[in-house]
Every structure is written in structure tokens, then in C-alpha cells.
Amino acid sequence: MTLGYRIIALRAVHSALWLTSALCVLQYAPEVLPCRATGSTLRADEPAPPDPVEAPFYADKSRLLVLLDEQLREQPIRTVEEWAQRRAHILASMQQVMGPLPGPERRCPLDVQVIEEVQADGLRRRKLTFAAEPGDRVPAYLLLPSGEPRRRPAILCLHQTHPLGKGEPAGLGDNPNKQYALELARRGYVTLAVDYPNFGEYRFDPYAHGYASATMKGIWNHIRAIDLLCALDEVDPQRVGAIGHSLGGHNSLFVAVFDERIKAVVSSCGFCSFPRYYEGNLAGWSHNGYMPRIREVYELDPAKMPFDFTELLAALAPRACLAIAPLDDANFAVEGVRECIAAARPVYELYGAGEHLVASYPDGKHDFPPAERERAYAWFDRWLADTAHRQAE
């Protein structure tokens, strides 16, 4: 297998260059499906059938306003339309490592089943499962605020590496710094916390089911979780965000890159550039819980990787993204976060949205302390919340 490995991406051809802005972007033409036990109506949407395409290899992933054409000649990017083609290359390159984004063959009715509902602290907490694909049900906690019935903003809350999985952000653990699904629900958001494969109550072997990585299975499950949120009567589908710490910090970025329904993202201790990750040793990214091709194909070498987090941040533009990167994070070197922010900023500025990309560098370790959580929640308030409604409650 070579760095020119052919991948699956969504259909697009450009008359002058090879990929259009439609490549690898989910398009939604809703199909209404029944939601069992909730009384809600759920929508499932099928992306266009994938076609195989190739993405060129960009050696310098910090120079983002450059596009490689079919002859691998550099072309300057001066417009949003031209950037969309580079963005398509980024999503294609991610799939070289993660495996292809699933298509209609894995989409099925969500068939939401509520296991229990608990009311406490002015909230309703529903334990439920939903069908991510045929034969696979994902456990989750849905937290619903009290107050007048209306459509509210919603946040997908992704957990860190912890045995409790979804239970920790939902408030069932003993670490108050990781209970962001609970705290955001108290703030007036509908929140959904789901288990990543082989955490909490969720057991699933992605490799036995045709996935090239647990990362891509997580992305697919999280896209389906957004399907669920957007279909709820309690949710405004135009105001959806994602948040996570550590494992959840990079998973929130991954799903947001592939699902543009997510309008605002917070990543706490979630990433740095690959060369800065443990001085370029990518072993931590290469086990079966992440992306084995990093070891098997790219030999743990950042210089051989088809993508980097510089590109992921830029691929979110112009949507709102807050990165929280403590100065003493032992997992993700703060210098590598600064490099990613600096590289992505020109893309945000291309959209006239430089203020939509923000980083916080608190004095601390690999944690999500109160001041940074408040910063994160205020970020969502800025981009998603209905202030008038919140003040009236």
C-alpha cells in the first residue's frame, strides 16, 4: 500500500481541478423514520453513493492556502470556492487513514429505545439505545432541561478515556471536571452523551464489521447521534454543537469535520500537530482503539501521514471552534496546538471569520477545570444559545 492509496470519497469532479466542494460533504435529503418509545419523529439521510478518487499528498500541512492540481503543481488559494477543493482533499486524506466514511449500506432506522428515565435537579435523564447500523445499537444518555416546551440548542458530549464512558459527562462519575453534559443541560441545552466503541456499556469490534479504524466507527456513530438530536421535537437542528475532553476532544473535531450540521465545537486537551505528539512518536494513535494504519501503512512517521490537525481545524472553517490547551498537558504539547491554530487561521480569515477560531492556554495539566468549562459554555452561548429565552427562565 502506498501514500497514493485509493480511498472512498463522495462524488465530485471539477472541470479544471479534480475535486469540488461537494466532495466528502454530507448532504441531507431527509427520510422520516419512526422513533420507538420517545414519541418523536426521527429523520435518516443518505449521502450520495461514493466514488473512488485520489487525494494528492501535501508534504507541508501548515501551508493550507495551496492546492495541488492533477499534475501536482501548486496553485494558490484565493477564494472560498478554491479552498473547498483543498478541504475535499483533507477529508479524502483522513479517509486514507481512517477508512471510508460509511454510506447508505450502513444507514437504517434509528429505532430509539428508552431503557429508563430519571427526573432530578430539574432535568430528565433518559438512558437509551439507538441503531447506528444494522445489528449495532449504541448506548447513550439524553439529558433534557426543564422549562417551557420549545426547541433548544443541543450539544453532543463525547467522553474521555474512562471506563464509565457516557456516564461521566452525564454526571454519574466522581470527577466534577468531566460532567459537561450535565452542566450544559442545567444551562438549558439538550445534551446527548454516547459510548465510544468498547467503553461504558458498548461492545463492538469495528474490524470484524468491515471498518479500517475504531475512529471511523466512532465518527459514524456520532453522525447518527446528530441524526437523533436533530430529529427531536425539543431540539433546534440549526443550533447543534459538540464538546469533548481528551478522547472526546479529538472525536468532537473528527465528527464536526464530516458533519456540517455541527455549528460550534469545543475541544479540551484533544490534539496537537502530529510532529509534536510525543516528539513525533505516533504509537498512541495507532492501536486498535484509534487508527491501525498509522502503524501498518505510515510506520508511525508524521512525515508520511496524509493529514494533520492543522488541516482538521481549517476544515471546520468558518464554523466556531474553541481549543483548550493547558500549558502542561503531557499528552498534547501546547506548542503543537499553537502551530495548528496559526496554520488554520488564514483559512478562517479567508471567510472573514477570524474570530470564529479561538484557543485558550490555561496554566494547568491534562484536565478540564471550572474556569475552562465556563469558557466553553460561554462559547456555546455565544454561537448557539437563545439568550432571550435563557434569561426569561
Question: How would you name each of these model-derived features?
Answer:
Residues A342-A343, V347-E393:
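C-terminal catalytic histidine-bearing segment of alpha/beta-hydrolase fold enzymes
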Residues A315-C321, G354-H356:
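Short, proline-enriched alpha-helix->beta-strand connector loops that line the catalytic pocket
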Residues C269-L312, N331-I341, E349-A353:
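Mobile cap/lid helix-loop segments that gate and shape the active-site cleft of serine hydrolases
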Residues A317, A323-F332, D363:
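Conserved strand-to-loop "acid loop" that flanks and positions the catalytic carboxylate
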Residues P102-P149:
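N-terminal cap/lid segment of alpha/beta-hydrolase-fold proteins
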Residues C35, G39-Q96, P100, H389-E393:
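N-terminal pre-domain segments of enzymes
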Residues R224-S286:
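Primarily recognizes the serine-hydrolase "nucleophile elbow" in alpha/beta-hydrolase
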Residues R150-R151, I155-A231, F258, Y278-E279, ...:
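Cap/lid segment of the alpha/beta-hydrolase catalytic domain
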